[in-house]
Regions:
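In a subset of proteins, long, contiguous C-terminal domains/tails are tracked
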Residues: 528, 544, 548, 581-583, ...
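Low-complexity, Pro/Ser/Thr- and charge-rich linker/hinge segments at domain boundaries
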Residues: 668-688
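Glycoside hydrolase catalytic-domain context in secreted enzymes
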Residues: 1-632, 647-652, 656
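Terminal connector regions
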Residues: 627-671
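Generic surface-pattern signal
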Residues: 15, 19, 31, 271, ...
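Generic structural signal of hydrophobic/aromatic residues within well-ordered alpha-helices
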Residues: 10-13, 266, 496, 726, ...
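Conserved, compact domain cores that house catalytic/ligand-binding motifs in diverse enzymes
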Residues: 681-752
Length: 766
């Protein structure tokens, strides 16, 4: 079959198509289907949401989940599944969704969504993986490989810098290239290089004043030329601003169709010569290639939704994060009388609203999933769908709390608090929930909170409750996963894929999120833990954090090469031991810290992780690899990644704030950074460039001699007044032109030195 694809002559097929057929191939037939050309054997194919389960609509189509879709399995949304830090698990989830797509005649699944969690307020954060681009990219690549192993395509989205819902169809994300390359692009880049998704979905927004749908730099220069993407680019639904400009920029497919309006504009542009027909042909070829890649591999397999439901439960169990377990209040014992309080115990919130909303065939709640011999009483406590303090419900909950040994409060955000289409205005739980939690704590200190939310919430009761389980949105089997973790049937192993700040104002984007036609990303590369850890700020819970019912120790950190060059790959290994009494899984995290940074960089950055399962007393060696990119930052002068020579610390930890082992390496890089030397170039800049460092030393020496009246020694009083540190600081920021005033140089001499230095830079001595 693969050979048949390779022998298919797409260019010949395209040559037989009319201009109208080619233009039509570049837009959808309707909300979900691509057009067919029956006379040439081009089939009609369907695409469908979504990132955590199929939202296939047979009748009325829409992109916001307003109309019904077929019954399907809702897997845990990305906000939860990313907390698994488990590539194999995510690949398995992808395979399962891919099988369901094959069986339902869906050619492309519209996901995963890998936009970075810039702010907790983004209404669509439940659908996104992480604040960290490395984690998001690794998880996304695994998911994509899983789906596409079933010969069903994916459409990674939303490319790019789509990090809020407010005015998402028109606002401009204003970010410098380094920020885009280091934070908002890498998850997409990793997906291309490790999984080659069949399709990309461009975002609604503008990037620095140009719509993503017509941004040639984004869709062609970066995506295709830099990264090597081979598939087709489709628009988000209704994202096209100028169809002809979009086609020229690299937008192949408009979704949904525009009732022929934009097809006519394409044909007119070809006829009047403003659009080259080869550009149209190239787009058609990309689309046909993916259509046939699916059509030639039609292999529907039987699947049972019940089995996939159990897979959804397993993913949720592997991902939920135990945040607090004071006095080992968890796991619960069947012999204990436990009060479950809160509507989410009976009717869980397990997915978000909008295009990814699944019509579940089955939903499991925690109340019905507890062990058969468990002693559980239930009180609703507060309505789960609105912020309303009900005195009668509260009184019932308080009475249950008084007679119980322990209380588990199922708190969280109602559907109306977060959804696609709008952002939150605050990080608070509904007031009615916080009020009831406070009252219950007055009568029952043995209280555990289970959170159902798509994005972090403030926790005013954090120091008073004994346990917190972050369940996020758990998918349709999330209730069973919660019950199994609470009762110790499953040992929690998830870790936070995002930082939980103490309060909203602590977030780095706080002053620059939301309103206006332009959103300025002034925090630059300091997103999430990159900001909090660099600032050494107090957080509620740090990135990568999560507890287990067992304990782990780390030892024997080994690094294969402590003096690498930028061309080397380094192997890092560490032993992890389960020092507790039950089996468990630990997520080992590797961070890199630039100790001699020549530019402003975060305190540390995640560059590796592995999840390892260990029996009690068992030790395993975890191995990870680092390459040039692991140490590099994006240099806009080089237009490339640059790993500067110097010392780097390899940090092994259980979270970004819990570093267990570290070792320093020294990297050497022969890569030359372009440098234009002029009158305002500083001595510090010359010192920091290996090609001009020696010349800078000579200039500084002459400058200091002139300052000392031609002598290398200063008077005692001067020596006391001017320290070496002062001189170093002054010379570091001194422009070359200042040598006229302070160094006894003429303007002509300085220009001659500049010419000499530029020559040294251009032809460095080997």
């Amino acid at each position: 079959m693969e050979e048949f694809i390779m022998n298919r002559d797409l260019k010949k097929i395209i040559s037989q198509m009319t201009l109208e057929e080619k233009a039509g191939m570049c837009s959808g037939l309707d909300f979900w289907h691509l057009k067919s050309v029956e006379r040439l054997g081009i089939p009609e194919v369907m695409v469908s949401d979504g990132p955590h389960g199929l939202r296939k609509q047979d009748d009325k189509g829409d992109h916001l989940g307003m109309n019904d879709s077929i019954k399907a399995v809702c897997f845990p949304p990305a906000a939860l599944s990313a907390c698994s830090f488990d590539r194999e698990l995510m690949e398995s989830m992808g395979e399962t969704i891919g099988r369901e797509a094959q069986a339902n005649d869906v050619s492309v699944v519209l996901g995963p969504a890998v936009n970075i969690k810039r702010s907790p307020l983004c209404g669509r954060n439940f659908e996104y993986y992480s604040e960290d681009p490395y984690l998001a990219g690794e998880i996304a690549a695994a998911f994509i490989n899983g789906v596409q192993s079933q010969h069903v395509g994916t459409s990674i989205k939303h490319f790019a810098a789509n990090n809020q819902e407010y005015h998402r169809m028109s606002n401009s994300s204003e970010a410098d290239e380094r920020t885009l390359r280091e934070i908002y692009f890498p998850a997409f880049e990793t997906a291309v290089k490790k999984a080659q998704p069949y399709t990309f979905m461009c975002s609604y927004n503008q990037i620095n004043g140009t719509f993503a749908s017509e941004n040639k730099w984004l869709l062609t220069d970066v995506l295709r030329n830099d990264w090597g993407f081979e598939g087709y680019v489709m628009s988000d639904w209704g994202a096209v601003n100028d169809r002809v400009k979009g086609l020229e920029a690299g937008l192949d497919l408009e979704m949904p169709g525009s009732n022929g309006t934009n097809d006519a504009l394409i044909m007119e542009a070809v006829k009047n010569g403003t659009l080259k027909e080869e550009v149209l042909d190239q787009a058609v070829e990309r689309i046909l290639n993916i259509i046939y890649k699916y059509a030639d591999h039609r292999a529907p397999k039987e699947f049972t939704m019940e089995k996939d439901h159990e897979e959804a439960r397993r993913i949720a169990e592997e991902s939920m994060v135990l945040l607090k377990n004071a006095d080992q209040i968890l796991p619960l014992k069947a012999s204990e009388k436990v009060a479950f309080v809160g509507g989410f115990a009976k009717k869980p919130r397990f997915q978000g609203g909008g295009s990814s909303h699944i019509n579940c065939f089955k939903i499991t709640n925690a109340l019905e999933a507890v062990p058969a011999d468990a002693q559980v009483i239930y009180a609703e406590g507060f309505p789960a769908d609105k912020d309303l303090y009900d005195e009668k419900l509260a009184a019932e909950a308080l009475q249950a709390a008084k007679v119980a040994d322990k209380v588990v409060i199922f708190a969280g955000l109602p559907d109306s608090f977060e959804s696609e289409g709008y952002d939150r205005s605050h990080m608070r739980l509904p007031d009615c929930q916080n009020r009831l939690i406070a009252k219950i704590l007055e009568v029952q200190p043995n209280t555990v909170i289970v959170l159902h939310n798509g994005s972090p919430v403030e926790m005013p009761w954090i120091n008073n409750v004994k346990g917190i389980l972050e369940a996020y949105l758990g998918g349709q089997a999330g209730g069973a996963a919660v019950a199994n973790i609470l009762y110790g049937i499953v040992n929690p192993s998830g870790k936070l894929a995002e930082t939980i700040p103490v309060k909203l104002a602590d977030n780095p984007s706080y002053l620059n999120f939301g309103g206006g036609d332009k959103v300025e990303y002034r925090e630059g590369v300091f997103v999430g833990y990159r900001y909090y850890d660099t600032k050494q700020m107090e957080v509620a819970y740090p990135f990568g954090y999560g507890l287990s019912y067992t304990t782990f120790t780390y030892s024997n950190l080994q690094i294969s090469n402590t003096n690498p060059t930028e061309k080397d790959t380094i192997t890092v290994s560490v032993d992890v031991t389960n020092t507790g009494s039950i089996a468990g899984k630990e997520i080992v995290q590797l961070y890199v810290k630039d100790m001699t940074a020549s530019t402003t960089r975060p305190e540390k950055e995640l560059k590796g992780f592995e999840k390892v399962q260990l029996a009690p007393g068992e030790t395993k060696t975890v191995t990870m690899e680092l390459d040039k990119r692991s140490f590099a930052w994006y240099n806009t002068e080089l237009h490339d990644w640059y790993a500067a020579s110097g010392k780097y610390e390899i940090l092994i930890g259980a979270s970004s704030r819990d570093i267990r082992l570290s070792e320093t390496i020294e990297l050497s890089n022969s890569q030359v950074i372009p440098m234009h030397i002029h009158m305002n170039t500083t001595l510090g800049e010359l010192f920091n460039n290996p090609n001009t460092k020696e010349a800078a030393k000579e200039l500084t020496s002459r400058y200091l001699a002139a300052m000392n009246g031609g002598s290398d020694t200063a008077s005692q009083s001067a020596a006391e007044a001017i320290t070496e540190e002062m001189v170093a600081a002054m010379t570091d920021s001194m422009p070359l032109r200042s040598l006229c005033s302070f160094g006894g140089f003429s303007r002509t001499e300085i220009q001659e030195m500049i010419d000499k230095l530029q020559a040294i830079y251009s032809n460095p001595l080997k």
